[in-house]
């Protein structure tokens, strides 16, 4: 960003010619070498890096460069000039990903009724199951309709209602990695805990959610889905069912805030948050090629 003003007594802001941080420096310093090493050591395990992904990396590395274009804004009152470089809009870019949240919250205002009660629900699978899904090439996007339909059906059943005219509002997103950047597919739902009759507009409130039952229903539905798709055998299905007798964890968190805008932003944060943040990086050793970062660990409990 570059700012200048007609009042030369005021100290001008000196522009940074490039958007740079610790996270971005990792890509700038090591991407070329990583590409060579990946092909030799990791391509057979994780697959080919597609051209689409390479383009996203290039966008990140060139984000915020004035040479890629900029917009010039001038205040008609004081004459202050603001020059802002174009950004990459890539999800890999942490700065652009954060701005996307604001865009999401604006779009949500068109579809989300903040007068209804909402909860953030996370449908997870155990670590050992996630590892198996990765090894067997499971397409995790299939988890979205499975979890959304399960939540809807259990909410309707709990309210003792029948008919397709009764519906909760549901926004869903799949996240493929956990806080430790490990492969950990899980689904985030931002859903109403109140039910709307879409024909009459009637709102059914104070619906009891069977939280414990939801965990068992999610395990049963997901294992049956994996068996149907040929990802696991009958024997493996029974073994996993016996191993996780308390079900697969489903986390509930009410979405509350003091005003409409904060509710929208919180919802966007749950659904569209990036996988990482620069502030998580504690130390980088470019010689040893190691990164130390902090994250919150969720324990995979069986008992």
Question: What residue ranges belong to the model's regions?
Answer:
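Beta->alpha loop/short-helix hinge microenvironment recognizer with preference
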Residues: 1-303
